[in-house]
Amino acid sequence: LSQNISSLISKNLFERILVHRNDRACGAKGFYTYEAFITATKTFAAFGTTGDTNTRNKEIAAFLAQTSHETTGGWATAPDGPYSWGYCYNREQGSPGDYCASSQQWPCAPGKKYFGRGPIQISYNYNYGAAGSAIGVNLLNNPDLVANDAVVSFKTALWFWMTAQQPKPSAHDVITGRWSPSVADSAPGRVPGFGVITNIINGGMECNSGSNALMDNRIGFYRRYCQILGVDPGNNLDCANQRPFG
């Protein structure tokens, strides 16, 4: 199945999409490799292998776009445009806090911080715990692995992408057309498309408030990547009029 992924996204395409990630200005330069991405996808066999070629390409574009927004080093007048600077960082910038929430199932380890790391910027002990359990790595005790081991890093992002967290569907099911909105979803405007994936990831901050720069940045990456991969981005790209999930 991993062969299917590499037949859709070659190393050459990967380099074109994430063209500036190894720029000297990028904190994660040298970290995110094509080989680590392909290796990580083997753990999540349905990723990029579900549906027809068009659907599969759209999923790859959507995943790389959402994660590029989370890790971008781009700015408005950046060389090759702001959407050529995804995967510039692998840890939250600034002085992030502990991101420790009370949890019986996934208690924080002493002295460990669970700030954003990796392509999806996984945050909080309960996400590190659940992701680590799913991929067979103790991330509660070793959260820095997500910024030190590129395969583990990609796996945490793929885990988030492939896993539904109630009441939200998985991003995978949305982009592959497997999610049908319930009445409770349709009334608040949550319809299939790239926009509802933004809602899944960060709806409370970015959705149901008209146009905003964060939401538009995600769409910008997605349009560029769809163009490179030769697919139509589809409808419902924004979440401007979608209420966040409960």
Curated annotation (Swiss-Prot):
GO terms for molecular function: chitinase activity; endochitinase activity. Gene3D superfamilies: 1.10.530.10, Endochitinase, domain 2. GO terms for cellular component: extracellular region. Disulfide bonds join C26-C88, C100-C108, C207-C239. Induction: By fungal infection. Its EC number is 3.2.1.14. It is an enzyme of class 3 (hydrolase). PROSITE patterns: CHITINASE_19_1, CHITINASE_19_2. It catalyses: Random endo-hydrolysis of N-acetyl-beta-D-glucosaminide (1->4)-beta-linkages in chitin and chitodextrins. The active site is at E70. It is found in: Secreted, Extracellular space. Keywords: Carbohydrate metabolism, Chitin degradation, Disulfide bond, Glycosidase, Hydrolase, Plant defense, Polysaccharide degradation, Secreted. GO terms for biological process: cell wall macromolecule catabolic process; chitin catabolic process; defense response; polysaccharide catabolic process. Defense against chitin-containing fungal pathogens. Belongs to the glycosyl hydrolase 19 family. Chitinase class I subfamily. This is Basic endochitinase. It comes from Solanum lycopersicum. The gene is CHI14.
